[in-house]
């Protein structure tokens, strides 16, 4: 494995297990957690927001009051793996605290480009927000993990979309973004095996590398908190990019917080630990969603 490949392979940096075992354990754990959440929680699965098989989302906590807060989760997998079937970590604690949880599914590379996925995420969120406004929902937070953090961050850089969502009364409902273990500069990925599916062009890199975009023309975003967080046992590149991206968006987002999670937190247990009501990110979610 080349040095660059290792830097962009977060499983190589955990102190818990070797890379292959870590990924295997994560996948098994994620599937089991999601299955248990579906069995233990009143939910609606596979709600379509688009025409493709993967353009669906799930709603956990359908028996909660109409005005219950909503926590949207966007899974990772380098834009080319996983699905919402691996995305149930936040469900038990949040639903127990009267927060609905909505994991979003989306199409994967190489069948689509990253830009297509971003468009899907926007459509999904618009659909969810429309329903949330109609039901009197109190607030919405959006969480993205790994590549999902990049997809969530994309919302901040589409001023036309924000303006449209604001005019329709949707955007003010979003009170926060939680970006966990994200990647925000895609250029170096062209030197890794991940690009075989991504097929990034130079234009793609310029458009999608949010940490190096020119944001001078971005309108200020008020009344929105962004938490950019990463574990200390994630890849050094992911740690640096998270810190740099947090600094970048401070130029137009009024409330930004960078959190480096200690205690050997890595790229995977940063979301696994959402099962724990006392985990720092879980406590922050509950705090900011007014629970």
Where are these regions (language model features)?
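C-terminal catalytic histidine-bearing segment of alpha/beta-hydrolase fold enzymes
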Residues: 229, 239-246, 250-291
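Primarily recognizes the serine-hydrolase "nucleophile elbow" in alpha/beta-hydrolase
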Residues: 126-192
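Mobile cap/lid helix-loop segments that gate and shape the active-site cleft of serine hydrolases
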Residues: 182-216
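Conserved strand-to-loop "acid loop" that flanks and positions the catalytic carboxylate
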Residues: 227-235
